[in-house]
């Protein structure tokens, strides 16, 4: 079974997806982290001038995904963690993900991972493009000021003001919604949830009734 959770940054997708996967004992795949991994690798000096086709054909990054562990991203042999949370990487990932070659490459990987077992996929086009026939589709929204507060917690203290981050989030939304390749949209048949004033437990209470009873 595939469950998709889509929505813009700061709506709580990652926290919800992890909690839902843990509750159901499903696998969890953070596709945003996959795009940020590509962006991080592409920003490294040795790879900035390499043609995109060659970069993807012999990538300096890799992913580990199995029934026993969540998605892990590597640059060479180095496990990427906090590097993927920087605003520079996030901003470049937004630009880089517009490339049709990049999206096709990533979607192929994501579909391969879906064969491993029951999975919760989190991203921006999971229910609309990658898994349009997913059994359960969720689309999260939240007020811009709430999203900015959440994202600030992931950034080094003092790196950005709430107002500046809110402006970046709104600009990112517009870019994601207006891009020609797989824009951010509410998937057909998705359940839309505003997470602004809800805890993760409250959101789970809304979602779990959508899951077949034998899986909950």
Curated annotation (Swiss-Prot):
InterPro entries: Cytidylate_kin, Cytidylate_kinase_dom, P-loop_NTPase
Positions that bind ATP: 7-15
EC numbers for this chain: 2.7.4.25
One annotated Gene Ontology cellular component of this protein: cytoplasm
Subcellular location: Cytoplasm
Gene3D superfamilies assigned: P-loop containing nucleotide triphosphate hydrolases
GO-annotated molecular function: ATP binding; CMP kinase activity; dCMP kinase activity
UniProt KW Nucleotide-binding keyword: yes
Stated name of the protein: Cytidylate kinase
């Amino acid at each position: 079974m595939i469950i998709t959770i889509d929505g813009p940054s700061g709506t709580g997708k990652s926290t919800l997806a992890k909690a839902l996967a843990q509750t159901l004992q499903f696998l969890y795949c953070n596709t945003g982290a996959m795009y940020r991994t590509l962006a991080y690798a592409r920003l490294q000096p040795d790879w900035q001038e390499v043609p995109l086709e060659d970069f993807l054909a012999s990538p300096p990054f890799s992913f580990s995904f199995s029934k026993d562990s969540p998605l892990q991203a590597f640059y060479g042999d180095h496990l990427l963690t906090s590097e993927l949370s920087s605003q520079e990487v996030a901003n470049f990932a937004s630009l880089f993900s517009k490339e049709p070659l990049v999206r096709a490459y990533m979607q192929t990987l994501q579909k391969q991972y879906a064969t491993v077992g029951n999975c919760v996929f989190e991203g921006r086009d999971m229910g609309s493009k990658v898994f349009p026939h997913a059994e359960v589709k969720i689309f999260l929204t939240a007020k811009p000021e709430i999203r900015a507060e959440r994202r600030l917690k992931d950034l080094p203290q003092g790196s950005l003001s709430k107002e500046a981050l809110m402006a970046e989030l709104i600009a990112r939304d517009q870019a994601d919604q207006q891009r020609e390749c797989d824009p951010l949209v509410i998937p057909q048949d998705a359940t839309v949830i505003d997470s602004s004033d809800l805890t993760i437990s409250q959101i789970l209470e809304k979602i779990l009734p959508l899951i077949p009873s034998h899986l909950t």
